[in-house]
């Protein structure tokens, strides 16, 4: 079977190929009332936004110099000159995206296709370019500089390859915060992804230009610290929140510079929320796999013979570099979440692998919420339909994921996951949903290693290192019964962030999160319609959300696999 996604993505490659100078910002935001205006000092600017019925939006506010020309593949630079008047009523361009094939062989069952096409990772990106470092700010109508509202700072996901602020609208969160009497300001940050933001290699390391996407996020937080008070926000009450790569980024922000999250002597954030992501054990920027990625990009860009290959990459046309960075294996492919681009230790900003920083206590110890979807791995196991035996599964992990892991360790890991039709993900579905012979088994392993059991490692390690830091955890099951996918990775964006179904899961999540943003406790001021959510330290209980109800379960499932992962964690670096 060959499923063509050409009708869905027909415009995608065109958008990706747009040169920077043609990237347009022509998506107007409806202005129903007098335009709200804010004056900031750092950098000096007057910012004019758009007003809706209950929410004011300032879209496309620059927080860094455009990373173009000599600043391409360089750390972000703060804006130092006055900007005059900015009409912030149109979305800025998304950062360059990692495109993928429009035809997927035997990949997506038709029963799952419709749901997947609604998730942000499958959305069309019609406006992308290198000049992309902008913020979106949304606040309640009538907010003034004296309001001092708490701030929810959103970091989008997309496997460090895809995504942008235009895919997410925080107005429903602001509106709900008003309705609940817990008003907030919602801020989104853009950051460079793919090879533009996370190019590895020894040359990148020597140049001091690793993990640019994380540095973009950090500069965005610093901009908020300098300027959010003018919008009516309280810079001392910032909560950072992300999903998937955004959630991984949240912990990376907690761990950057050895856990120093201060700026001008004050903390950049006081709380954290991680939806589907935490620590990703990773080899250094100049590891062998990273160097292969860099060398392949250099070769694809025609820079192999250059005296300085990085200088060459900075000078090639935008479309040449875009195609070169996208010539390596991508997220939505056979290699799945064996990512080409991701945060890697650089010895300066991300000083060590995140798991080591966590265990050594080198992270900002702020209260946090962290959780997962029940079937995190199903979406990433759709592309390997040729795998039908345990031996092939072992080879797959050895070839694509864990190059330094002994075969015996990989075999031992697989042995903790039954090789039958009943077990595996989507979980609790008996004989159903085995898309190919090893699908449910592979989906379970991918989901556990990257998200679910790694979350448990994160929580238990954090409790050991910092037992007084409050934490809460959840497991979402609201899409139980969805064919093939179950409650899949990214489904919380549809259910919780966008609220496409106004059900218990959506309303409970918003109530808990808004209470946390306001008070650092998801139970403080939350309606009695929702149960008291115990801290993880109180018996390792997970809030378990279904579409129409919620409950609690113990975080002890798949304990044999968990124990094995903990005992062999050094073998599972990517």
From Swiss-Prot:
Its EC number is 3.1.1.1. Residues 1-17 form the signal peptide. Disulfide bonds join 95-132, 303-312. The active site is at 244 (acyl-ester intermediate), 376 (charge relay system), 489 (charge relay system). GO terms for molecular function: carboxylesterase activity. GO terms for biological process: lipid catabolic process. One of its GO terms (cellular component) is extracellular region. The keyword Cell inner membrane does not apply. It holds the Pfam family COesterase. It is found in: Secreted. Optimum pH is 6. Disruption phenotype: Impairs all extracellular esterase activity. Does not affect host cuticle penetration. Induction: Expression is repressed by glucose or other simple sugars such as sucrose, fructose, galactose and mannose. It catalyses: a carboxylic ester + H2O = an alcohol + a carboxylate + H(+). InterPro entries: AB_hydrolase_fold, CarbesteraseB, Carboxylesterase_B_AS, Type-B_Carboxylest/Lipase. Belongs to the type-B carboxylesterase/lipase family. Secreted lipase that allows the use of hydrolyzed lipids as carbon sources. Has highest activity with methyl umbelliferyl oleate (C18:1), whereas much lower activities are obtained with the respective esters of palmitate (C16:0) and stearate (C18:0) (24% and 12% of the activity obtained with umbelliferyl oleate, respectively). Hydrolyzes 1- and 3-positioned ester bonds in preference to 2-positioned ester bonds. The production rate of monoglycerides is lower than that of diacylglycerides. Seems not required for the penetration of intact host tissue. This is Secreted lipase 1. It comes from Botryotinia fuckeliana (strain B05.10) (Noble rot fungus).
